Amino acid sequence: MNPRRKSRLKVVMAVLSGLAVAVGLTLYALSQNIDLFYTPSEIIYGKNNDPETKPEVGQRIRVGGMVVDGSVKRDDKTLKVTFDLNDIGPAIQVEYEGILPDLFREGQGIVAQGTLVEPTKLKATEVLAKHDENYMPPELGDQMKKQHQPMGISEADLKGKSERDATQISQPFGENK
């Protein structure tokens, strides 16, 4: 190979190597910002009731649902707030420290983004309130339709206090009674 061709090959290889590194770093950065969307029922049971698809403790997720009436507890000395969130099924607890949106209230639909710190507890870094009480985010509405239409929903389910949910949460993984 002549010297001119060698130098061209070196330049092409350097450009391709730089491009590969840039693509790799971009994909890594994007993977750090991907937050999967779940409903409270999907956190408890897994997507499509498959326990293998439950989010893991420590995973960053987004969860959407309704704030359970009577569940909002505020700390008098700090901006820390805890509340329960459900979607016609079991409720999960959300802990948030900061200023809540003006539209946040009990019975209101919200989306919380944060880290799952326990199987049924989310430490939120951001809380978004819906703008209209009749509005339902499309992804939340679709998930609720898919998951809850075939189920018999009781009044206790609507309030996040179903006995069936309590027994399933307390059972170790894979154990059926």
Swiss-Prot record:
<feature type="compositionally biased region" description="Basic and acidic residues">
    <location>
        <begin position="156"/>
        <end position="166"/>
    </location>
</feature>
<feature type="region of interest" description="Disordered">
    <location>
        <begin position="134"/>
        <end position="177"/>
    </location>
</feature>
<keyword id="KW-0472">Membrane</keyword>
<keyword id="KW-1133">Transmembrane helix</keyword>
<keyword id="KW-1003">Cell membrane</keyword>
<comment type="function">
    <text>Heme chaperone required for the biogenesis of c-type cytochromes. Transiently binds heme delivered by CcmC and transfers the heme to apo-cytochromes in a process facilitated by CcmF and CcmH.</text>
</comment>
<dbReference type="GO" id="GO:0005886">
    <property type="term" value="C:plasma membrane"/>
</dbReference>
<feature type="binding site" description="covalent">
    <location>
        <position position="131"/>
    </location>
    <ligand>
        <name>heme</name>
    </ligand>
</feature>
<feature type="compositionally biased region" description="Polar residues">
    <location>
        <begin position="167"/>
        <end position="177"/>
    </location>
</feature>
<keyword id="KW-0997">Cell inner membrane</keyword>
<feature type="transmembrane region" description="Helical; Signal-anchor for type II membrane protein">
    <location>
        <begin position="9"/>
        <end position="29"/>
    </location>
</feature>
<keyword id="KW-0812">Transmembrane</keyword>
<keyword id="KW-0201">Cytochrome c-type biogenesis</keyword>
<keyword id="KW-0735">Signal-anchor</keyword>
<protein>
    <recommendedName>
        <fullName>Cytochrome c-type biogenesis protein CcmE</fullName>
    </recommendedName>
</protein>
<dbReference type="Pfam" id="PF03100">
    <property type="entry name" value="CcmE"/>
</dbReference>
<comment type="similarity">
    <text>Belongs to the CcmE/CycJ family.</text>
</comment>
<keyword id="KW-0408">Iron</keyword>
<dbReference type="GO" id="GO:0017004">
    <property type="term" value="P:cytochrome complex assembly"/>
</dbReference>
<dbReference type="InterPro" id="IPR036127">
    <property type="entry name" value="CcmE-like_sf"/>
</dbReference>
<feature type="topological domain" description="Periplasmic">
    <location>
        <begin position="30"/>
        <end position="177"/>
    </location>
</feature>
<keyword id="KW-0349">Heme</keyword>
<feature type="topological domain" description="Cytoplasmic">
    <location>
        <begin position="1"/>
        <end position="8"/>
    </location>
</feature>
<feature type="binding site" description="axial binding residue">
    <location>
        <position position="135"/>
    </location>
    <ligand>
        <name>heme</name>
    </ligand>
</feature>
<dbReference type="InterPro" id="IPR004329">
    <property type="entry name" value="CcmE"/>
</dbReference>
<dbReference type="GO" id="GO:0046872">
    <property type="term" value="F:metal ion binding"/>
</dbReference>
<keyword id="KW-0479">Metal-binding</keyword>
<dbReference type="InterPro" id="IPR012340">
    <property type="entry name" value="NA-bd_OB-fold"/>
</dbReference>
<dbReference type="GO" id="GO:0020037">
    <property type="term" value="F:heme binding"/>
</dbReference>
